[in-house]
Amino acid sequence: PSVRQITVEQSNTSVVFDERVIMKLIRKIDFGNNPEWEMGQFLRKHGFRHMPALLGGLVLEGAVHSTVAVVHQFVHVESDGWAWMVGQFRASPTPSASALAEVRQLGARLAEMHAVLATPTTDPGFAPEPILREDLQRWASSMIGELGVTIAHARDRVPELLRLHDPLIERINKLAGLEPSGLKIRHHGDLHLGQTLRSRGDWLIFDFEGEPVRTYVQRREKHTPLRDVAGMLRSFAYASATVELEAGVQAGDRVGPTREAFLDGYRRASRATNLLPRDKDFEVVLQALEIEKVLYELRYEMSHRPDWVAIPVRTLLMLEEGR
């Protein structure tokens, strides 16, 4: 049997055995079960099939009960979602009808995953809960805190952000003022195109570990499923920006039609659930979550990839212009 290590950049170590099984070795150990192990078990138990099959895990028992590895079926794929989307954007400044159909399908698959995660259960870690006014206020307060930290961090390099402070707070405060609707559930927590795979003309979603910088307790927190949606929408923007940086020019609006197709697929597949905010509040919630994501991106790019700072800054300026 063959053994090889996956060499792409990641926060864990992945080893493929005989091109049939992949084991992820968890580098950052925390107390309790890793969220990927928990999420994989729940999704498998309740019939979600659009993910690599969970085969098992390794748990360190004793005083420190921790997941040290998770094992999945190794899936031979056409590409991951990031490579696929960048390829589509390179091929044409306007997404093709077939590409938009596949993006619409991706939205539907995410909605199906969220519907499974909203399955009634006696497990308190996964039982869906109604969103309360206190949740909306807490989320908005956290976003406003992140906004202050981000602008303080970026004000010297990106002085135009100072004028965005009040308009962005106004948008975030709309979230806090909503009448609560929809459910909060366990969700992916770190969703982007790189966490999806194209296989046999369909989509798989994987890597349910959540953001590695967060503790297990933080990663288990329930939230509106639109948090995952916001992450995917930002990934579309990054794929387009990557192609523009390669070409040295800003192309036509690739992202707009892609967003619309994804949201159309997601909302259509969610109609039979009570997961989402009421229709008139959907955009308010989603925009606040996108702002939260963009603020994180700006802090990350300033620390790790200064040449990419323009991507989140451009989004914030477009928000101010009402686009």
Model-derived segments and their meaning:
Residues 39, 135-138, 142, 160-174, ...:
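Exposed alpha-helical structural elements
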Residues 1-152, 193, 199-275, 279-282:
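Conserved ATP-binding subdomain of kinase catalytic cores across diverse folds
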Residues 98, 156, 304-308:
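Alpha-helical structural elements of signaling/regulatory helical domains
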Residues 180-186, 199, 220, 285:
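Alpha-helical hydrophobic/aromatic positions enriched in membrane-embedded helices and signal peptides
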Residues 249-253, 257-274, 284-323:
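ATP/Mg2+ or Mg2+-diphosphate-binding catalytic cores
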Residues 187-194:
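Canonical protein kinase catalytic loop motif
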Residues 1, 146-186:
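An alpha-helical support segment within catalytic cores of ATP-dependent transferases
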